[in-house]
């Protein structure tokens, strides 16, 4: 007796992001096993990330064989003059198109590129462990060294922030347990006025810890150790009223530049994964939430690789883009960027996550116009368009293996109906495989191509449907083979056009019981 042809629909494939932590069988089909060079677009679909445009023209000449630009800061003076500072190859630069070295104090030697650049009170301050702090007055390209009378000289600290009307610094080469603060509105004075410091050795809840990072959040000064977080109130007048309000034990920050504020949350990397410190104004409580639980094993493997290769975590960078509604966490050694969609958490508290490859960022900065700029080996690039420096890049989506809730039957796939948004002139490959194989059957086709005579491509919608200049592509692809579980994948060579996966319809016959 002939079996009835069934239609199986994967609506919004990958909508829930990657999940490599849970068992794939029985997992919601809206999860993906692979979503590389993808974002969750504004309509909740998996789509291609944007590309990048190289802006710097003299990168190789000034950056040599170094890691490239490792940090970027846009400074806007009170006179409304914009200066972009960046650092790499043991140099500090101004400019974007042409990187021009700043003038350093006579005899000043830079040995690392792990600068913390801070805009404060119409000046830019430069802090790095083992280096005397520097200042650019009102955006000047001539930097001077911070000096102070007395014994309390400006700390040569790895971490520094601006908050509560002053600068705060911690983590020097010889002291990782003291937090220093400058005088009010004077980032150059660390000795007189209202400057001061606090020793945290008796404050940590679980014995000795080391300061890694600091942040101002919800009216508190947060001090992040490697294993604990200290919450201080009264930072507006620290010499008189700095008070330990709360401690969060067992979770700290292990990468200074992973800390990013989203306005309502504070995101940071810990030994347990990527964490969110949620803001509740009424109670001023600070609950923790692991937002990387769906990929925790993969993320921690990237972290381990970073430590094994470099012996530290300084190269790990994070950034929050409000206009794109994502948080990026880059691991240079494994050449992967995790892209977390921060619009809303999933039911388990995790954020939807995709990955990026081939970008290889060394630093991030979001400018005043909300544009995302990235430091790379060859200079400064802008996150924009759908080419990587005029070169195509590959977007990859693969489902988790699924039995379509009929575990006892063989599945004979007959035809795929795809609904793709965008994708003009995009070379695309449909993949399908059975029973956990990594060897997929493939069908290639190109949207916008006049040639549709490839095997298995039975119908091709060349006109599509248009809405606000976005084309809707609906190719239909014949398929073969059978198995008990099925994996589906789409690979697309992004070619200067957006590409989002709306829906995958599968026509299948259910066979005998296994």
Show which residues each predicted segment covers.
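Short glycine/acidic-enriched loop and turn motifs that connect beta-strands
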Residues: 131, 173-176, 273-275, 379
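Short loop/turn positions that demarcate and connect the beta-strands within blades
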Residues: 66, 154, 206-209, 253
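Carboxylate/His-rich catalytic cores and anion/metal-binding grooves
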Residues: 162-187
């Amino acid at each position: 007796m002939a079996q009835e042809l069934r239609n199986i629909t994967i609506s919004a494939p990958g909508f829930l992001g990657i999940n490599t932590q849970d068992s794939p069988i029985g997992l919601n089909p809206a999860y993906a096993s692979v979503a590389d060079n993808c974002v969750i677009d504004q309509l909740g679909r998996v789509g291609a990330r944007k590309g990048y445009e190289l802006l710097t023209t003299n990168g190789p000449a000034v950056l040599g064989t170094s890691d490239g630009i490792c940090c970027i800061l846009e400074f806007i003076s009170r006179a409304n003059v914009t200066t972009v500072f960046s650092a790499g190859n043991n140099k500090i630069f101004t400019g974007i198109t042409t990187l021009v070295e700043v003038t350093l104090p006579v005899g000043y030697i830079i040995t690392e590129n792990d600068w913390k650049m801070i805009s404060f009170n119409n000046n830019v301050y430069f802090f790095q462990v083992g280096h005397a702090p520097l200042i650019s007055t009102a955006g000047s390209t001539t930097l001077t060294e911070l000096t102070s009378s007395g014994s309390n000289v400006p700390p040569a600290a790895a971490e520094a922030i601006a908050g509560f009307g002053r600068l705060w610094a911690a983590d020097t080469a010889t002291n990782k347990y003291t937090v220093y603060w400058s005088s009010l509105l004077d980032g150059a004075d660390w000795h007189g006025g209202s400057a001061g410091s606090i020793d945290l050795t008796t404050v940590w809840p679980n014995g000795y810890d080391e300061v890694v990072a600091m942040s101002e959040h919800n009216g508190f000064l947060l001090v992040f150790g490697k294993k604990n977080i200290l919450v201080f109130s009264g930072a507006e007048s620290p010499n008189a009223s700095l008070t330990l309000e709360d401690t969060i034990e067992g979770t700290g920050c292990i990468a200074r530049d992973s800390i990013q504020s989203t306005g309502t949350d504070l995101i940071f990397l810990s030994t347990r994964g990527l964490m969110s410190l949620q803001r509740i104004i009424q109670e001023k409580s600070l609950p923790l939430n692991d937002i990387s639980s769906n990929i925790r094993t993969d993320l921690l493997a990237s972290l381990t690789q970073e430590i094994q290769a470099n012996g530290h975590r300084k190269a790990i960078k994070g950034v929050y883009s409000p206009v794109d509604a994502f948080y990026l966490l880059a691991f240079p050694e494994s050449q992967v960027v995790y892209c977390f969609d921060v619009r809303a958490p999933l039911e388990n508290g995790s954020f939807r996550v995709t990955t990026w490859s081939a970008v290889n960022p060394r630093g991030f900065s979001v400018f005043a116009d909300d544009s995302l700029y990235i430091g790379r080996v060859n200079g400064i690039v802008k996150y924009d368009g759908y080419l990587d420096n005029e070169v195509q890049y590959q977007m990859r989506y693969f489902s988790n293996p699924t039995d379509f809730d009929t575990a006892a039957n063989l599945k004979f796939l007959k035809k795929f109906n795809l609904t793709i948004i965008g994708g003009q002139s995009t070379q695309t490959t449909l993949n399908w495989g059975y029973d956990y194989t990594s060897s997929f059957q493939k069908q290639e086709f190109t949207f916008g191509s006049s040639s549709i005579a490839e095997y298995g491509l039975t119908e091709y919608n060349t006109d599509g449907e248009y809405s606000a200049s976005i084309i809707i592509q609906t190719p239909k692809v014949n398929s073969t083979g059978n198995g008990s579980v099925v994996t589906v994948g789409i690979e697309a060579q992004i070619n200067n056009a957006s590409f989002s996966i709306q829906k995958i319809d599968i026509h299948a016959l259910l066979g005998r019981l296994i």
